[in-house]
Amino acid sequence: LSWANLTQADLSGANLSGADLVQTILQTGLPTTWEWQQIHGQGTRIVDGRTLSLGRRSRCSQHCGSATYETGRVYVAPWFSRDTTTECHPGLYVAGNDYPVGNDPIYIAYWLDEMVVAGDAQEHKVRVPRFRVLAEMADFERLTAADLEPAPEPQPAEATP
């Protein structure tokens, strides 16, 4: 279809399987967050009108830093990028079903509306600004919206005379 001018063409019923659609408006792009979650995620449920998602990842950071994610804690990325053009930007990563997560995988919960599908969708990973580490998959059904809020920062004690 290189250089084809399809202006006002009626393509309904056309079989384009095998056609090279790269750099056309018909090119298959990145999946929506919902599509990604349905294909690569572990599940979803509605909590307080939002879609809570279940995913998995490695317990220890594999590429940036040396973070080890502990069960029961909420983690918030110090920086988060919504850029969808590159696969490696600031954020916390979620692995798809086919993505290797090492010998100690963990289940995590995160909000679907905060998720970014980016870069090469074949990587089967996405990023989120925060997630909660679960002890087991069954914990997902008991989570509330408050469970995804980070713990308040400890305040310094006031000096007393």
Feature annotation, model-predicted:
Residues 27-89:
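ADP-ribose/NAD+-binding catalytic cleft of ART/PARP-like enzymes
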Residues 80-139:
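ADP-ribosyltransferase catalytic core
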